[in-house]
Amino acid sequence: MASRAMHDGRSVVTTCGGCYADCAFAARVEDGRVVAELPVPGHPCAARALCARGRHRLAMPFDERDRILHPMRRRWDGSGFDAITWDEAFAQIAERLLGIVDERGPRALGMTLGVPSFDRYWAYRFMHALGSPNVYGADGACEVSRLTGWEHSLGYSPASDLAHTDCIMYLGRSIVDSSTMGAVDALNDARGRGAKIIVVAPRRSGSAALADRWLRVRPGCDLALLLGIAHVLVSEDLYDHEFVDRYVTGFDELAQAASAWTPEWAESMCDVPAAEIVATARELAAAAPAAVVDAGFHGGIGIAYANSTQTARAICLVDVLLGCIGHEGGALNPPTPLVLGDLDPTRFATPSMPREPKLGSERYPLVDPMRGLCTTIGQSIFAGDLRGLIVYASNPGAGYGNAQAWLGILQQLDLLVTIDIRWSETARASDFVLPDVTYLEADRGVGTVVGANDARVFYRNAVLPILHDDTRPGREIFAGLAAACGVGECFDFTCDDLAAAQVAPFGIDLAALKERGWADTGMALPT
């Protein structure tokens, strides 16, 4: 499949590896470059076009600037790196990993993952095979505060029904500047049919420029603005009585607390004029329940401020007062998740789930323990609890807050291994650096899309063969490390074995799925 597009000019349906969105495109190789054909009719991730990031990613396989081309080992004097063989890399890394396990136990090992990465399945499996629970996603550097606030207020983070809303308010998020082309199109469609767009942002972003109302908030003070809006909704009796009476507990206590959140108080905190706060609250209420304060994403609402969790809870509060939860045009309930199949443990050796909690979970008990908090890695290193770290498709030395401090903390580890495509700040600070391949050079397996009434799966096909002989997909790297660590039996399966097991419950043929790029599961899922 990978060589088909490379050598005969035929198109291969795949998805972009630039972010979570998995925008679908049909790829072919033409004059030494990858050409993306869009849209892919019927594909659940169909997009009109790729965004700037997605277009840039098409050239990455051919761009050797800062590309890691061989396994590298830091010189003993720290003066640079030397290329080594994969066998040497696996053996030497395994020796040091097992040494840490023998001395401190498996909980002294950790891994932090970037996104997106299909090979995270192998990453988790590798750490679990060694007995370590410490696998951390990127949420802790992106949006864990927001997610925690929503999960402890509503149980989930809802999606805004932009297609049907009459009024939507965004905080700390600019769809125009940073989202998929599909999201930009949806926003323009909403404007075209008369929906009101309210943008809360300190600067005049692309979305603020086209908004009906731009609220120029003091950075980090969105919470005060939301509380001021809640005050108006309660004091002017603009909230949804039926929704509150049926679904809400503690409203009397809320009403009492809200009496202090006057628009004038909010103005003193967030710099948005009191009159604008009142007008915004009334505009949202007039459109409710087809009105919504968007749940947010990264940035200031995601994690950037000490009050980001409380800000997410305040967004939930306003949406509840509007009665828009689960309502068309409001904040949609999540659909029932689609559970993929898994490898048969009677055929494939499967590591046990570690019983101990992730390091850091005791300090932040509200954070989902399965998700973890990657930013606690530094605290665990400083305390001496974490001695070995694998960094996969991530860059704490630049992507986490206070990057210089992170680089200093990482130097305290007994072992630091980076697996990535290009040299990064973290890679340059590592003991070993292992070269990954770009997303176009390897199959990335099965993904899912669950809509309001149905569920589909799609396949992320490779477009190119591996262009540099000494680079390897993440799954092969973890399998090699596992074999060197004596747990290779847990990796005696292929990418196709896993993908076939994942779609088997739906009666989907893997070869047909790869050829078409997507398939219906035949399941009707209630929301």
Regions found by a protein language model. Name each.
Residues 40-44, 384, 490, 501, ...:
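Metal/cofactor-centered catalytic core regions of large enzymes
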Residues 91-131, 301, 307, 311-346:
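A short, flexible N-terminal coil/short beta segment enriched in small residues
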Residues 60, 144-327, 335, 345-348, ...:
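Non-catalytic alpha/beta scaffold blocks inside enzyme catalytic domains
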Residues 28, 38, 52, 69, ...:
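Residues in well-ordered beta-strands of folded domains
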Residues 1-236, 273-274, 390-392, 481-483:
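N-terminal export/assembly segments and adjacent metallocofactor-ligating motifs
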Residues 289, 518-527:
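Short, intrinsically disordered, charge-balanced linker/junction segments flanking boundaries
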